[in-house]
């Protein structure tokens, strides 16, 4: 199959692509587009720090020198992952514009897979692949729709965190038919970002299974959500204050060090 992956230029997307692309490339032709960020760059100091560790640290400080090394680490940078693609990964921040639609059509995908992509697809984009658009959402649907929902689950004291694999059926956010929900125990010693990253091994396995089902010309079983759930935007200062009072952290550099070091050759 021809599969187009839509992702965001951040750490979690890269971790997910490292899990997916080597396996998908064995059987499928892959192309990929990325958004630079989700929403606008935050001005709150706490969220700005999170943005630095998720995005700026990789894109401006960590990955450029690694890309110039002759060897590769256990995880690949975005440029390194391009080896699994039919063409280098392309920026696409305007997928609903005429040029954006043309870019998606040029890949001629049978299936589109969205992972943390920072833009909303309109119906013209959704209708391009004849098999449809899959999305791997880092939260339990329909309860936790929107962005940074691991934050909301931690704030609520949830003992388990979830990812949801679902179809994007229309332009509404995180409302499509649900294929599977994968849970992992909350790490009480982890931070928001480390707990979010822990969702992707099981989430990507579910995604690979669904793609294998489609490749076999079958349809994954999918169920329409039984309620609209709750939609969350970025946390405001009150939510952040409550998060910190509960003893949580957005980022713990010590917890991220093993992940970041995995990009360096050993």
Q: Which residues fall in each region the model found?
A:
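One-carbon transfer enzymes
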Residues: 1-266
């Amino acid at each position: 199959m021809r599969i187009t992956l839509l992702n965001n230029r951040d750490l979690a997307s890269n971790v997910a692509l490292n899990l997916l692309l080597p396996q998908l490339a064995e059987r499928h032709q892959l192309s990929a587009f990325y958004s630079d960020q989700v929403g606008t760059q935050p001005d709150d100091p706490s969220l700005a720090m999170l943005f630095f560790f998720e995005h700026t640290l990789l894109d401006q400080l960590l990955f450029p020198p690694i890309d110039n090394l002759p060897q590769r680490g256990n995880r690949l940078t975005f440029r390194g992952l391009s080896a699994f693609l039919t063409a280098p990964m392309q920026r696409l921040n305007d997928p609903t514009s005429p040029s954006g639609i043309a870019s998606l059509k040029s890949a001629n995908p049978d299936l589109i897979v969205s992972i943390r992509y920072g833009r909303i697809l309109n119906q013209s984009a959704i209708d391009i692949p004849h098999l449809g658009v899959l999305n791997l959402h880092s939260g339990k649907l329909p309860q936790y729709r929107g962005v940074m929902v691991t934050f909301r689950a931690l704030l609520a004291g949830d003992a388990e965190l979830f990812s949801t694999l679902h179809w994007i059926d229309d332009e509404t956010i995180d409302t499509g038919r649900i294929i599977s929900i994968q849970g992992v125990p909350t790490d009480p010693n982890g931070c928001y970002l480390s707990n979010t990253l822990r969702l992707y091994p099981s989430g990507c396995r579910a995604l690979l299974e669904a793609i294998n089902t489609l490749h076999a010309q079958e349809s994954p079983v999918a169920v329409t959500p039984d309620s609209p759930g709750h939609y969350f935007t970025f946390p405001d200062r009150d939510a952040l204050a409550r998060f910190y009072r509960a003893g949580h952290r957005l980022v713990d550099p010590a917890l991220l060090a093993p992940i970041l070091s995995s990009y360096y050759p050993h």
